[in-house]
Amino acid sequence: MDEITFRRKINFCFYFRHVYICVLIALFLQSSAYSQTSDKNRDKKRKVEILYADLLTNENPGSDQKKLLGNVSLKHNDILMYCDSAYLYQKSNLVKAFGKVHIEQGDTLDLYGNYLFYDGTEEKALITGKVELIDKETHLFTSSVDYDVANKIASYTDSGRITNAKNTLTSIIGIYYADQKMFHFKDSVKIVNPDYIMTGDTMDYNTETETAFFTGPSEIKGDSIYIYCEKGWYDTKNDVSRMWKNAVINNKQQIIKGDSVFYEAKTGFGQAFRNISIADTSNDVLVKGDFAWYYKKPEKFMVTDRAMFIQISKDDSLFLHADTISAVTVGDTAGKSFRLMRAFYGCRIFSNDLQSKCDSLSYSFQDSVIRLYYAPVIWSEENQLTSDSVAIFTKNRQADRMELYNSAFITSLVDSVRFNQIKGRSLKGYFRNNKLYKINIEGNGEAIYFLEDKDELIGVNHAKSSSIEIYVDKGKITDIYEYQNPDGKLDPPLSNLPETLKLPGFNWFDIIRPKKVSDIFRK
C-alpha cells in the first residue's frame, strides 16, 4: 500500500468517526427532548387524586364512577378542589362537583361557585352558580366561568362584575389572564370610581397597576371633566391618562383635542401633541397648534408649533399666528379673575377689515384690548399705520378704536410711486362697523397728501400742525383738518420728484401684509 492510499484510509476513518459521534449526539438530544415531552404529557394526564371525603361509595360496581360525600377534597397537578359532594370518573379523569365549590391554585387564586365540571385531561373547568374569582385584591363575580387551569385563563360571556379597593367594573364578556394580572373586556364595559365613570366597548385592565387600556370608543365622565378617545390608557390608581385617536378633554372651561393627549387629573396638568385645539366656548376663542400644555389651577395654557389663535365672530373672525401663544387667568384689584393672552415672536393678524404684524402682543379679556409691541404695522383697507407700540380697543369682538404711541405714521398709496403720508407723536383711530373712519394726530404733526378731482391729481399739500384730524371713507382720505398753528403750502402735482415727497421715517410694508388667512404663516 502506497503512502497516499494509506492517508486516504486514515482520513476516511476520522471522517466516519466524526459522523458517528454527531449521530450519537443527535440521538441523545432527541431522546432527551422526547423524555421531557413524555414527562410533561404524563404530568398533564395525571389522574385526579382524592384527598378526603366523609363518605366514598361506588354506586355502580364495575364502573369507574365514584361518589364522594361531605368535605370533599381533590387534587390535580397544582390545584386543589373542595366541595360538598362530587362524582369522580377515574378512567376519563372527569369531576362533577356540587355545593360550595372551591378551586385553589397557588397562593393567590381562588375560584368559588355552586357547580363544577372539571376535565383533568384537558385541564379545563366550568364553574357555575354564584361564581366568585379572587386573585389578591381583585374579585370577579359572575354566573358562569370557563377556566383554563394549565394557562390560568378565566372567561365569562354572560355579564361579570370586578371589584377592588376603589373601582367596580362590569362587562358582558370578559377574559382574565391570571399570570399577567390582565382582564380583557368586551361589550358594555363600565368602570365606576368615586370620582368618575368610564365606559367603552372594548377595554383591557391590569389589576396590579390598576390601569385600563382602551381599544375602541371610550368615555370618562367626572363632575368637572369629560374625556373621549378611541385608543389609550388610564392609570386609575394615580389618575393619569394617555389617549390617541380623536382624543378630547372637556373641563367645562375648555375643550382640548389632539392626535395624542396626556392628562394628570390630580394636578389638572395636560399635554397635547399634533393637530391640537383648545376651544374656549364662553369667549368664542379657538387656539390651534401642534403642541400644547395646560394647567387647570391656576388656569393657564401654552401652544406652539404652528400656533394659531382665532377670535370667532359671525361677521369677521380674527386669526393670529405666532411662534408661541399662551394664556393665564389672573385676578384684578377687585378680586375678579380674567384671562390674559400673550403671543410671542413673529405675530401676524388677519381679519377681513384689519391686518397686522408685530413681534409680540397681549390680549386682555378684561378690557378687550389688544396691545402690539416691537415695530407693529397695522393695515386697514388702503391705510398702513406704524408706531413704536399700538393698543386696539375692541367692543363686541370688533375694533372700536386704536391708539398708536410714539412715532405714529399713517401711509396710503396714491399711485405706483406716490403716497399720502401723515405722522406725529401719537395717533388715535376710530372705527365704525369695524372700518376706520376718523384719525387724530397729536404733537409734531406733518403731512404730505395729494389732492384729486375725479381721480386726477391736481396738487400736493405739505402741512405742519400740532393737531391734525383726518376723515376716511372706503379706505381713502376724504378730508384733513389742521389745528393749532397750521403751516403749509400747495404745489402742483408734478413739481416734485416722487422720491422727494417722503417724510422722515417713511416705509411701505405692503409686501409683508397678510392678504388671506394662510399668509399669517408666511415667514
Where are these regions (language model features)?
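Bacterial Sec-dependent N-terminal signal peptides
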Residues: 1-41
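N-terminal amphipathic/hydrophobic interface segments
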Residues: 34-523
